[in-house]
Amino acid sequence: SEFTPVTSDLTEKMFKEFFDSSEAAVFTGGPDVAAAFSSLPFDHLLFTGSTQTGKLVMKSASENLVPVTLELGGKSPVIVDENADLKNTATKVMRGKTMNAGQICLAPDYVMVPKGKSEEFVKESETAVKSMYENLKYNQNYTSVINEKHYDRLNNLIEDAKEKGADIR
């Protein structure tokens, strides 16, 4: 990602160390590099990123009939069974949600719990987060949202939820 140059550089370094250039390669850059790269006649192309960019990659790759594997942003629901251990489940869900500030494709976006168990699940989730991170906002060991655009998007979602009556804690 053009938003994480240090991670991209480390990934490139590791690939060069462990793979022959004929097996795998890492290319870094922004949308211009991605557009040029995805129009080349590769045997296969793997893209991880946003749905919007994934559509552009797929379109460019289709010009050369290049098979494409896309790992795109999803909603990652969690369905909690009626017999689930809510404390254990909440801990696992919150660990997944808080990893990298929720900025990974598998971070759960919503949880469906059986009727009558939502309040208990919320309390267990709050306890789980507090046990992992005493303080999220001022924690030097917890990452932040990647950029202002994404920060604003999240704040808009929170405001929309509040306007619709959500209990934001």
Task: List where the protein language model places each region.
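ALDH superfamily catalytic-core signature
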Residues: F19, H44, Q52-R169
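Active-site phosphate/pyrophosphate- and oxyanion-stabilizing loops and adjacent acidic/basic residues
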Residues: K13, A35, K55-K59
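Generic structural signal for helix capping and beta-alpha/helix-loop junctions
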Residues: P5-V6, A34, G54, V78
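CheY-like receiver
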Residues: D9, A36-F37, K92
